Amino acid sequence: MKTFSAKPQEVERKWYVIDAADKVLGRVAVEAANILRGKNKTIFTPHVDCGDFVIIVNADKVVLTGNKENAKIYTRFSGYVGGKQVDTPRKIRARRPELLLELAVKGMVPHTRLGRQQMTKLKVYAGASHPHEAQQPTAITL
């Protein structure tokens, strides 16, 4: 029996919605990353984008355990001398709450062209509403 390898044109994409209200950040991110990669499907192939679309709502209500809200550090670098910028989740949540979940999921997908392609299927919204009702997404409970 030969090993099955999915072809990109054979992959059928579905839409899923995850409500992140009062859920732990990492638990939501793991579930989203697995669906984006297609690891929940029987046709999973590591080098093919066989994942589905994921909508995460209520990103502003996601929970961090312990003292991570103040102690965890996100760093970025502009490329210029002295261009290192450090943020805590509290600052990021005040400025753009969706970014916390986007960064968490981004760290869980491959850091390649395939991972960037998979990240385009992630839609994160701070509030409870989203503009993708026409796709009839399936709700996922954690």
Curated annotation (Swiss-Prot):
Keyword Nucleotidyltransferase: no
GO CC terms in record: cytosolic large ribosomal subunit
PROSITE patterns documented for this protein: RIBOSOMAL_L13
Pfam families per record: Ribosomal_L13
Domain of life: Bacteria
Keywords: Ribonucleoprotein, Ribosomal protein
Transmembrane region(s): none
Any GO molecular function: structural constituent of ribosome
InterPro entries reported for this sequence: Ribosomal_uL13, Ribosomal_uL13_bac-type, Ribosomal_uL13_CS, Ribosomal_uL13_sf
One BP term from GO: translation
NCBIfam families assigned: rplM_bact
Family the UniProt entry places it in: Belongs to the universal ribosomal protein uL13 family.
Assembly notes: Part of the 50S ribosomal subunit.
Job description of the protein: This protein is one of the early assembly proteins of the 50S ribosomal subunit, although it is not seen to bind rRNA by itself. It is important during the early stages of 50S assembly.
Name the record gives this protein: Large ribosomal subunit protein uL13
Organism (species): Akkermansia muciniphila (strain ATCC BAA-835 / DSM 22959 / JCM 33894 / BCRC 81048 / CCUG 64013 / CIP 107961 / Muc)
Originating gene: rplM
